[in-house]
Amino acid sequence: MTSVMSHEFQLATAETWPNPWPMYRALRDHDPVHHVVPPQRPEYDYYVLSRHADVWSAARDHQTFSSAQGLTVNYGELEMIGLHDTPPMVMQDPPVHTEFRKLVSRGFTPRQVETVEPTVRKFVVERLEKLRANGGGDIVTELFKPLPSMVVAHYLGVPEEDWTQFDGWTQAIVAANAVDGATTGALDAVGSMMAYFTGLIERRRTEPADDAISHLVAAGVGADGDTAGTLSILAFTFTMVTGGNDTVTGMLGGSMPLLHRRPDQRRLLLDDPEGIPDAVEELLRLTSPVQGLARTTTRDVTIGDTTIPAGRRVLLLYGSANRDERQYGPDAAELDVTRCPRNILTFSHGAHHCLGAAAARMQCRVALTELLARCPDFEVAESRIVWSGGSYVRRPLSVPFRVTS
């Protein structure tokens, strides 16, 4: 008897993250503009877009699909996490978003990526050698989690001894966006984070360095009692800490079972390491760590046969769009390291395309290159992978990893 997957959408949990793909495919095939009406709170209804063409179009149309009310399906999100008066850059629309992004981008140049790459490689090699000497271990704890924290800290100019604070802040804020979110912990985390970075901003006024905060301070943001400017820098640090860590962890951690299951694909990369940059694009497509983010409609908009009213949340399901057979062919769900996929939505698209995409790609390329060179015959205990909670970012908390040669 063949089972039929329901095309009802459910926000993900740690229990469902291992395999959301059948639900996504059912949505794409049967209800690509899906309307979710919570039985207990029908006024909190929202829509889910699952096909690549629809998600791509919505992501680039910031005038219709606004980020200014928040990025989850929770109405009142900014109030929930204490950022109503100081929304971060990712929760702003052009032209406000555009002007600040221009200033911030000075700290995200190709030179910055090149500068940090040797440090990334050294860190990756040290951690992999430790894992290899021990015959394996939890590769997320040892490598994939601390790696992006180190890079985010580099971009923000945070001293090494303070890096570990990032994880606690991120976990508390992500928890607040669960259905029954722990908002008190999130508010405490935001308060602690803002206090820390307020001190760092003041320090950079007298001790400038080559980092994003220093560039903003040097541009005069927050100078001479400009409280709004200082708050905008703080909101930017919020975006970096909460958004810059989990995506790289999700991609690298999510890639381990994919490569474990497909030794033929791993062998292609071992035989031709020059193909690793293209493989990174394919792994970014399939893992899609940020599985979806929401927008709010500014007007009535019709997609297919469905009209979405103004003022409704719309979840752009990047993880589904990246596996859409209409875009990537009938084998879209399969790993093909030679695919060279175009127009992936892993870093979104349009005005809100991820500012740190180049740095994320570099980390993934370096980590994958060194992993395959030093541990070519690794194994992963898939049944023991533990996934993080939260409904928007798919990342493992633990991936048991064994070196077999």
Curated annotation (Swiss-Prot):
Substrate binds at residues 93, 97. One of its GO terms (molecular function) is cholest-4-en-3-one 26-monooxygenase activity. Its EC number is 1.14.-.-. CDD domains: CYP130-like. The keyword Heme applies. It comes from the Bacteria. Its cofactor is heme. The lineage of its organism: Bacteria, Bacillati, Actinomycetota, Actinomycetes, Mycobacteriales. Belongs to the cytochrome P450 family. One of its GO terms (biological process) is cholesterol catabolic process. This is Cytochrome P450 130. Heme binds at residues 101, 243, 295, 318, 348, 352, 354. Keywords: Heme, Iron, Metal-binding, Monooxygenase, Oxidoreductase. Inhibited by azole drugs. One of its GO terms (cellular component) is peptidoglycan-based cell wall. Pfam families: p450. It comes from Mycobacterium tuberculosis (strain ATCC 25618 / H37Rv). Homodimer.
